[in-house]
Structure formats: structure tokens, C-alpha cells
Curated annotation (Swiss-Prot):
Name by which UniProt lists this protein: Cytochrome P450 monooxygenase ausG
One Pfam family here: p450
PANTHER family recorded: CYTOCHROME P450 (PTHR46206), CYTOCHROME P450 MONOOXYGENASE AUSG-RELATED (PTHR46206:SF2)
Organism: Aspergillus calidoustus
Pathway of action: Secondary metabolite biosynthesis; terpenoid biosynthesis
Gene designation: ausG
Compartments, record wording: Membrane
GO terms, biological process: secondary metabolic process; terpenoid biosynthetic process
Swiss-Prot/TrEMBL cofactor(s): heme
Gene3D superfamilies: Cytochrome P450
Listed GO CC annotations: membrane
GO MF annotation list: heme binding; iron ion binding; monooxygenase activity; oxidoreductase activity, acting on paired donors, with incorporation or reduction of molecular oxygen
Length: 529
């Protein structure tokens, strides 16, 4: 649930093979009558020649300049390459320089080597600011949810100071709901059944998070959960398609694209569900109801009042859902695939189950039990190391011209990212391409304070770094550990005969392959949890 961190915008987009070249744009007859086809063509070609922004004051090398003399064709090809081949572009760029430029949907961005991570994280003139909103076209109706990324403190502060403090109180809710949700997905069949880890993780974690964010009644409303999970997935896909167009044409395209119209309907329908709940609470409170609600509806309102900062309750809830649903479900889905890929998976499964049983036999699900899941913590961090949420991370906007410590110049107005490659650096991680389950357990035993799943360091930027690191990572870690514990104790898990599926690449995002499958079979758990 990272706010202002592109590694967790997560999330939640279609793979490149699903992105369509926008050549199917249908203009309504009325628009042609008003504007005239010649006028539209003139606008199109003026934009093509004059407005595509490859102009950049930086002298850093440009990795994907595109081909062609006409700006829009060159820009389209560069954006298409960015969407489908960013990992290759980053590798190519780093082979040439420690700082380089990449043509992206929102202009030309600067990508820096990992050694700059701490400096970028702490620099006072580099902030998430407007870049998230620009990436997701927040000025266009249907995408206004993203306007709060990096600009509003209400959400991040609510998560940091209120959600995190409630983790102990929320654990009973998570542990009670998880087995019911898991059983509804994987059933109790004593024979092997093929399932989607991606769909299972999203189903369970979206419902758990909804109960925490909006309370019992609305959190169990299937329409609410459907709207938020659908918006989560479709908004990123729609933004990817929209970003293939020049910025000046995107508002027009968004008015005509069915996918963008659907986003506007989701926001309208979600507001119709949330507003009555808020109004009912406020009405009851004004008539003496002293009931305390322990959910994000109240946390956001309290934080807004304390800070004197306005917020939109609906858009804030939708942004919370985007961060939480994707971050947690992507991590859980990927770790299931990584575990099944191990040749010694059965041995590792026994070790994980032994740890779960040992941790829970005392007081059950409490903070101590969750902290004692050390091997599981290491497994999750190792999975995130091998498949982070994004190819580049820590997006920052330069509010003025900056000179880094080695003299590298960052022009004012630039968008800067860190290449997310340190987690495969053999100087930091021996056998960097291997999944080693106890890699971080061993480091913890040696006193490495950065070896915890929730720890943020320049060597492992899974949850960001510095003051803008993901504030919801503690909740996400607890949530995933609880669900994974139920899965491992209650089910045998393996790959089907066709084996693993590689992650999908879509722009900056590295996504757990939504087409991947695993096989599950009910087993008798050693203890009741």
C-alpha cells in the first residue's frame, strides 16, 4: 500500500500483449459535424509535429528515442517500447551510464543507478509530488483517484499513525475471516484442483482490506468489493492505453473510450454506496450515538480534521484499495509460485508448517506469533527481491535544478526514478538469481536490521525508501502472513504439469502472471488456527 511510490501503484495492469494500439477510435457523428474531419486532422498533425515532448534540457543519454521524422510516430514507438520492454531498456541504459533518460508516456524521465537511492530518498527538493498524477492522467475524469498520490498527506498519515497502531486489534478480524474466504475459493476436495493464485490472493485480500477500511456492513457488500477490485485492474489498463496517445489528445480520447467511461461509472456507483454509510454515521453521532468505529472511514476523517486538510472520502478509499489490494495480492500470488518452483518444496513446506505450529501453540495469533514467523518472513522478502512490483521505483519530481553529490545534473521539472536492480546485484546477494528461502533469516541471525520484510534499505527497495516508503507495509505483511499460514497448514500445493509462468511486464510494473496456475488439495491441519 505505497503512497507516492511507483513500485506499489501497483500494481494491476494488463500485460503488454493485452495493450491495443489505439487505432479503433470511433468519433461520434456529432463531433465530426461540429469540428469537421479536416479540423481534426489538422489538430492531429500539429500535435504530431510540434507537441511531442522529446525536448529536454538534460545532456544525459536517451535510450529509446524512437524512429521516424514525425513527432507523433516517433513518440508512439518510444512509448510502445517503454510499455513492453522497460527491463531491457534499463539494462541497456545502465550499461552506458549511471544516469540516463527514457522516453515515457508522460515525457522524458531520468533513471539513476541504485547507488543514488539514499540521496534521492532524502533530498528535500525531490518529492513524489505531481508525477503520479501525471502518469495516470489525474486531470481526466475517471482518473481523479490518482490526484492524491504524493500530494495529500491525509491518506499516508492515516495509514502511518492510525492503521499501524491498530494492527494488534485488527488481527482477530483477519484470522476469523481468512479461513472462510479461503474455503470459499479452494473448497475441501481431497483430490488435486487447479486454481489461480492471482485470483485467490486478490479475492481474499481485497475482502479483508475492505472490512478494515469501510467496516463490516459495506466491507461485506459484494457490489462495493467488485467496484473497487474492478477499478483497481481496469484503471491501470485504461491509463496504459491512454498513455499511447499524445497528452493533448488524451482528454478527447478518454471521452470516447469505453474503458474510460466505465471508470467514471465505477466512481459514481462507489460514491452512491459510501455516502449513505457516512451520512448515517454522522446523523447517529449528532443524536448522541457514542459508538466507536475502528476503520479507515473514521481514521481519514480524524486525520483530516487534525491536519486541517480537506479530502474526498470516496477517492481516498479508492486509493487505499488500489495500494492495499495490489501490493498484498501480488506478493502473495508470487510467493505461491516461487514456493512451488522449488525442487525441495515438500521439505520447505514441512519447515514452514513446523514454524507456524510452533508460533501459534502459545497464545495464538498475536504480535509475538507473527514476529516468530521468521522463515516465512524471509521467504516473502526473497520473493519480493526476485520479483519486485516495478522495474524502476522511487519516482520523484525535481522542484528546482539539482546537482547530486557526484555532479550529475537534474533539471528543474524532471521526473527521476531509481533502477530497481540492486536486489539482483551479486555483490550484495550471492547467487542473486536463485530463490534461497532462508537468505534473510541468516542475515537476521547476524544482526542485519534490514533483513526483515518490512525493512526498507537501498539494497532492497521492495517497499520504497526513506520518508516516502510505503506506510502500509506493516499491515500488508501481517495480512499476507496470516493468509499464507492458513494456506500452508490446510492445503498441499504444487505446480500443474505445465509448470511455472514468468511475470508480466507492463510499463514500469512487474506483475505476477495472472495466467499462472497451481494445484491445491485439502489436507488435515495439525492444529486449528
Amino acid at each position: 500500500m505505497a503512497m507516492g511510490n511507483p513500485g506499489l501503484w501497483t500494481h494491476f495492469s494488463r500485460s503488454p500483449r493485452e495493450l491495443r494500439i489505439p487505432n479503433d477510435l470511433e468519433l461520434p457523428n456529432g463531433l465530426l459535424v461540429v469540428c469537421g474531419l479536416p479540423g481534426l486532422l489538422l489538430l492531429f498533425f500539429v500535435t504530431a509535429i510540434l507537441l511531442y515532448p522529446f525536448r529536454n534540457k538534460s545532456d544525459l543519454p536517451l535510450i529509446n528515442p524512437g524512429k521516424g521524422r514525425i513527432g507523433i510516430l516517433r513518440g508512439y514507438r518510444a512509448r510502445k517500447t517503454f510499455a513492453a520492454e522497460l527491463p531491457r531498456l534499463v539494462t541497456e541504459g545502465l550499461s552506458k551510464a549511471s544516469a540516463f533518460r527514457i522516453a515515457a508516456p508522460d515525457g522524458v524521465n531520468i533513471v539513476l543507478a541504485p547507488r543514488y537511492a539514499h540521496e534521492i530518498a532524502e533530498h528535500p527538493d525531490l518529492n513524489p509530488g505531481p508525477i503520479a498524477g501525471d502518469e495516470f492522467n489525474c486531470h481526466i475524469d475517471g482518473f481523479e483517484v490518482f490526484a492524491q498520490l504524493g500530494t495529500s498527506d491525509v491518506i499516508a498519515e492515516s495509514v502511518r499513525t492510525r492503521l499501524t497502531r491498530q494492527l494488534t486489534k485488527l488481527t482477530p478480524l483477519l484470522t476469523t475471516e481468512t479461513p472462510l474466504l479461503l474455503q470459499s475459493q479452494w473448497k475441501d476436495a481431497p483430490t488435486w484442483v487447479e486454481v489461480s493464485p492471482h485470483e485467490t490472493a486478490l479475492f481474499i485480500l481485497s475482502r479483508l482490506s475492505s472490512l478494515v477500511f469501510v467496516g463490516d456492513d459495506l466491507g461485506r457488500n459484494p457490489d462495493w468489493v467488485h467496484i473497487l477490485t474492478s477499478y483497481n485492474t481496469e484503471a491501470f489498463a485504461a491509463a496504459q492505453e491512454l498513455n499511447l496517445w499524445p497528452q493533448i489528445l488524451r482528454p478527447l480520447v478518454a471521452r470516447l473510450k469505453p474503458s474510460c467511461r466505465q471508470l467514471r461509472r465505477y466512481i459514481r456507483d462507489a460514491r452512491a454506496l459510501l455516502v449513505p454509510v457516512i451520512e448515517q454515521r454522522r446523523h447517529a453521532q449528532s443524536h448522541g450515538d457514542r459508538r466507536e468505529y475502528n476503520d479507515a472511514i473514521e481514521w481519514l476523517d480524524q486525520t483530516s480534521r487534525s491536519a486541517g486538510q480537506p479530502y474526498d472520502p470516496l477517492l481516498s478509499q479508492m486509493l487505499l484499495a488500489i495500494g492495499s489490494f495490489h501490493t498484498s495480492s501480488d506478493l502473495l500470488g508470487q510467493v505461491l509460485l516461487d514456493l512451488c518452483s522449488r525442487r525441495d518444496w515438500e521439505v520447505l513446506a514441512r519447515e514452514l508448517r513446523k514454524e507456524i505450529i510452533s508460533s501459534l501453540q502459545g497464545a495464538g495469533w498475536d504480535k509475538i506469533a507473527l514476529n516468530n514467523l521468521k522463515l516465512m518472513d524471509s521467504v516473502l522478502k526473497e520473493s519480493q527481491r526476485l520479483k519486485p512490483a516495478s522495474t524502476v521505483t522511487m519516482g520523484r519530481y525535481a522542484s528546482r535544478e539539482i546537482r547530486l553529490s557526484d555532479g550529475t545534473a537534474i533539471p528543474k521539472g524532471s521526473t527521476v526514478f531509481i533502477a530497481n536492480v540492486a536486489m539482483r546485484d551479486p555483490k550484495i546477494y550471492p547467487e542473486p538469481d536463485a530463490f534461497i528461502p532462508d537468505r534473510f533469516t541468516t542475515r537476521r541471525e547476524k544482526g542485519d536490521s534490514s533483513a526483515y520484510l518490512v525493512s526498507a534499505s537501498p539494497e532492497h527497495i521492495g517497499f520504497g525508501l526513506g520518508r516516502h516508503a510505503c506506510p502500509g507495509r506493516f499491515f500488508a505483511a501481517n495480512e499476507v502472513k496470516i493468509v499464507l499460514s492458513h494456506m500452508l497448514l490446510k492445503y498441499d500445493i504444487k505446480f500443474p504439469d505445465n509448470g511455472a509462468a514468468a511475470p508480466s511486464t507492463s510499463g514500469i510494473f512487474l506483475e505476477t502472471n495472472p495466467d499462472a496456475r497451481i494445484c491445491v488439495r485439502r489436507r488435515k491441519e495439525e492444529i486449528v488456527i
